[in-house]
Amino acid sequence: MTVRMIALCGAAALAFSANPAWAGESTDDAASAAAAEADTGAGEETIVVTGYTGTKTDTALMELPQPVKVITADQYQAQGAISISDTVKYAAGVLANPYGRDTRVDGFNVRGLDALQFRDGMRDIFSYYASITSDPYNFSRVEIVRGPASVLFGQGSIGGLVNLVSKTPDFTTRGEINLVYGSDDRKEVLGDVNLALAGNLAVRFVGRARDADTYVDHVPDDRVMFAPSIRWQATPDTDIVLTGLYQEDDTGSTSQFLPIIGTFRPNTVAGEQLDRYTFVGKAGWDRYAGRSLQGGGAITHRFSDAVKLSLKARYIDSDLEYNTHYADSYTNPQDPFSVYGTDGRTIALTADASDARMNVFSTDNNLQFNFATGAGIEHKLLVGIDYSWNKVAKRYAGGDEIVDLYDIDYDALATYDPTGPFIKESQKQLGIYVQDQIRFRDRVSVVLGARRDRVTGSSGQKDNATTFRAGIIGEIGAGFSPFFSYTESFLPVAGRIDNGDGSFGDPYRPQTGTQYEAGVKWQPTPNTLVTATAFKIKERNRVLYLAAGGTTQSGELNTKGFEIEASHTLPGHFELLANYGYSKLRSETNTSLDYMPRHIASLWSTRTFGLVDEAQLRLGAGVVYSGKSVSTSDIWSIVTPSRTTVDALAEISWNNWRLAINATNLLNNKYFASCLARGDCFVGAPRNVMGTLGYRF
């Protein structure tokens, strides 16, 4: 990236351009909150956490009949997160990086199902390999809604969604600068400056510049990110926030799609194994490089204590160049090298080149009414309308050649340049929703909601759906609050059935799902919360990719599971998070779909100690466990073993300075994240160590 060193210097200059005093953690607009508010009590601090994403209203988590997880930036940075996928690995029922670290996309499964990613309550990814990944430093927190959420968010995934909440200005002047050096020659400068220009006007600048390699040769991980925002409180009742983002990535693919034979299983003919981090492409040509430009705004106006208007909109313009190679381990997964020779080394290598452009416009607008209908009966009535339009255009080129995968002549590999017309697909979605949160005598909460969606695709395909949600939670004493909920989901699928012979059939049917869930939340003290829940999900019309080529759609799939999540926090002193999740998918006709680990567990804890001269030492450690996974096809089954990784943190802070050492996969466990019966394997990321020198002002 030609601008990398200029950007490093520029980010440093930006961060040092302000000179006020540091005022602690970032505090974003309470109107978009799911934040922790600390009030000093009798001898300890009390944490009241509200969840916005679960209901689009500020509601205490103990009043939500659905599990919602809020992960603050301080938490996931302490855990050593370097991607959005990493931020969610200590959440119950969430599998982060199911195919290992992937520099191209963020991957996470919620309740065994792929989860959609939202930004500030609006979906921001509509196609694989058409945009670059989001930067975790640009967000104040990550929210996870487990279970369907279509009533509020429209087209959504069945298992749940991950919502990223952007950093926005407040009216306290402060800032920070961080210098990072780490594994794979990672060099970074990060800056976050918040300036209060007046009592009702503030700006914020968040930036990152990174020059880094990865554990795979010839795959860089370079980034420039700059996110300005401005907040104007026009009146005491009117709040306006404008946000922007420019991000440029120059990376490749850490997922090399290596054959099972020669990695996970022995290659008895060749008599040797491939290195687990083998690069199979052409240096300088294989790349995943793109740019994302975003602009958005939010207006909140309170007409009175009883009526509030919220308006949001965002536009995304992104482009991407994606060139890659991968071996043909799919024609004969059990012996891929025998297809092209007898030496156990020769295989076909496919080169794919693509250019992609993506444009997205989203808006979400609602009115909230607070009123009472009797003694001790309070309502939060939400009525809203949202609209989104997205267009994705791609063009392709590529070819195949025969290579010795153990000794590739990289210079001889052919390259391709997409020059043909772009293949375009677009989609429009309009939704109307209504939700009523009813609170009875400050002990029982009922949530009722309904939504109507209309989706139109560029092929003329039209889908309509009505989805519902209902839930109840009530406090029965001793901090126990049992809950029950029913939710539905609706996800239109663009395109048509691929017949596998170059022709296409009927349009895809929308994916739909329903979920029943029952559980209990226990809050014995204000700083402790335990949630246990059991669920059953029924899913229809998942798109399936056939081994012989082409696609089809599933019939009915059923997923059952159980989760338990516990947290105990004393701000500034101690933190403990413990999670366990179990899920199992059943299909009457296709056993190959149950390939995700059934068991996921994690434990994370930090403790802060006082040192001399007001210095503090914070130590942290965590363990993440993923159970074995089984991938099945008509010819064989592949069992990927369970794995356990350890993370650690050591941090010293003194006055405005901070020195931190983060390590993920501390013991350097060399594991496979997933091996698929179709023929390829994905390795887990090795140990990553980062040192951070930070200054807050």
Where are the regions that the model predicts?
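Membrane-embedded beta-barrel scaffold of Gram-negative outer-membrane proteins
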Residues: 299-302, 306-314, 318-324, 475, ...
